[in-house]
């Protein structure tokens, strides 16, 4: 479906059930995930994905023998694009804990909605967060010289989170998830991490190759959950990271997933970060910007053998009502190294503009460049996100996390 050039609102319909923090079933660390013995192995193909025909044809949502597993020898047939960080070939088993019906429904929801390739997918069912060893760099120690821009602003109960993803052109995905017992969220995914490329969009239509899409849960680059907690990452220069053998490791992108799935606010997110040593195996070093619906924000930086938490509470009298991050470390607030014009522009605008008057997408357009693949504006208090692909700021796509009717069925309409 070609929707490029039309001014559209994409309202993703969502459901909510009983919610709670993830329990012991979600395990992240150097030892991997638990309960693998309960899963039934299935055959694998040369794309490194599960052979659906080998799985019992049942729609049961509770039978463990209907869930999916990948064999450890699985590997993709196609070469990964430059600067991608493929995970499919590294999986000892799929992160999916779906029934066959959920697996089929998830792939059936995959839909291309923009010619600057953007897909939507609604993941049904459960998944595990996999350990950091799953990532492998296709271009070891090599990072493109691109930049990203993130900001958060809050005033009088209204918060906004903006993000430019500046990188090589790859197919992108808006992913909706709601794993049992955890929080619903919307997130943005660069599908190059799954081995997809601009030169092979037909792979999304291949029943064999598209199955890698179920691993998209593992690699969000920015997103927001139902409580309004929002998070994004930006590349920074590599520095020494913590290496405590007594502390479990978690990959940076898995931390994004953990936060979206299990934290309601910045304080809870900080407590999750404190439980892990964040690693960047097979991917560039990044720092994190987080903001919630209550005026709290935080920049998290890993480097110099430690983790820094730069906290801001916009509800405190005299405190600034914004934070931002680009592509240099902020932990030395008096003299941050490597400041860029984008950060200066964000600082100037956010310091001088009342949130009521702020035009967040316009600000992102001013700090974007030719490599800006998507611009996303999240509204934590409303559960909404606007996405612009390829700097097409005249035609934003609007997604709504709060619509509850007709779960799993996107509906298109005029912009609100």
Predicted ranges, named:
Residues 232, 238-365, 369-372:
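A surface/extracellular/periplasmic glyco- and lipid-processing/surface-interacting theme
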Residues 10-11, 30, 145, 210:
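Mature extracytoplasmic/luminal segments of secretory-pathway proteins
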